[in-house]
């Protein structure tokens, strides 16, 4: 299978939350990922896996227009969310990022108190309810309330790495998104903190659609319902590699009976 001949995948979900339709993303003249068709199921966890440089983080950032912040980045095709093309001129990217939140690879709490890490974003987004209740609910949903409830006035930066990442998840939850994107959220964490994040993700999927990029295939098996495998190949002329979607299916099928040889080779460790 080549990047220029990737077939349109079969429909996986009858209730897609986000649909990528022939999406190609470029940085100036360089194509990073090409011709992606994919439907992200609602209320599930979808993992994006593949070797470094295959475009999975680029695709993840396209789902809430974070790539807009990168100079020279452009997208063709359509990213549909609840019937709207997110790249339509009349769509406000700030509102897109409120409805589709992001948790980054490195924990990045605000240099504020734990309380204000949660309250600040909600406040600037016009939240009018009981702020104390929102802070507690968000921290509980991110499974960090018990560790923070007695030190809400302390800096969020004083927490451990795993606690900081769960604080960032709580901060994302507080603005009441419909989708949460996670870009390798456990790569900087120890195994115990990773387990807590994964347990939190399982709880959150009852309320949110989650899309996660991970290099850890065991993590993809543990947490995701669906998996998209991306690969990359050298472009004509040898000017770099372009990423493309090889296969998208239920996680169990991807890891136990993949349809593509490249998927089997990757999950068995023959490359990557």
UniProtKB/Swiss-Prot annotation:
Residues 18-256 form the ABC transporter domain. It is found in: Cell inner membrane. The keyword ATP-binding applies. It catalyses: phosphate(out) + ATP + H2O = ADP + 2 phosphate(in) + H(+). Keywords: ATP-binding, Cell inner membrane, Cell membrane, Membrane, Nucleotide-binding, Phosphate transport, Translocase, Transport. It is a peripheral membrane protein. It holds the Pfam family ABC_tran. GO terms for cellular component: plasma membrane. The keyword Signal does not apply. GO terms for biological process: phosphate ion transmembrane transport. ATP binds at residues 50-57. Its EC number is 7.3.2.1. Coiled coil: none annotated. It comes from the Bacteria. Its main location: membrane. GO terms for molecular function: ATP binding; ATP hydrolysis activity; ATPase-coupled phosphate ion transmembrane transporter activity. Part of the ABC transporter complex PstSACB involved in phosphate import. Responsible for energy coupling to the transport system. Belongs to the ABC transporter superfamily. Phosphate importer (TC 3.A.1.7) family. The complex is composed of two ATP-binding proteins (PstB), two transmembrane proteins (PstC and PstA) and a solute-binding protein (PstS). This is Phosphate import ATP-binding protein PstB. It comes from Prochlorococcus marinus (strain MIT 9313).
């Amino acid at each position: 299978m080549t990047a220029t001949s990737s077939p349109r995948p079969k429909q996986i979900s009858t209730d897609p939350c986000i649909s990528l339709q022939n999406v190609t993303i470029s940085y100036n003249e360089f194509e990073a990922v090409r011709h992606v068709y994919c439907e992200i199921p609602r209320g599930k966890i979808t993992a994006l896996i593949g070797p470094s440089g295959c475009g999975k983080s680029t695709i993840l950032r396209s789902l809430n227009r974070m790539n807009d912040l990168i100079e020279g980045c452009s997208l063709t095709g359509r990213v549909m969310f609840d019937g709207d093309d997110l790249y339509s001129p009349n769509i406000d990217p700030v509102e897109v990022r409120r409805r589709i939140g992001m948790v980054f690879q490195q924990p990045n709490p605000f240099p504020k108190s734990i309380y204000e890490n949660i309250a600040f974003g909600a406040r600037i987004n016009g939240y009018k309810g009981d702020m104390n209740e929102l802070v507690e609910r968000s921290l509980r949903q991110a499974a960090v309330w018990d560790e923070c409830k007695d030190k809400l006035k302390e800096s969020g930066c004083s927490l451990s790495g795993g606690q900081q990442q769960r604080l960032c998840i709580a901060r994302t939850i507080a603005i009441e998104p419909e989708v949460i994107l996670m870009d390798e959220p456990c790569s900087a964490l120890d195994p115990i903190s990773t387990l807590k994040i994964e347990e939190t993700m399982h709880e959150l999927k009852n309320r949110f659609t989650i899309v996660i990029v991970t290099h850890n295939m065991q993590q993809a098996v543990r947490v995701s319902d669906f998996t998209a495998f991306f690969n990359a190949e050298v472009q004509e002329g040898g000017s770099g590699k372009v990423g493309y979607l090889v296969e998208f299916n239920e996680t169990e099928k991807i890891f136990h009976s993949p349809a593509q040889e490249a998927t089997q080779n990757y999950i068995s460790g023959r490359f990557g």
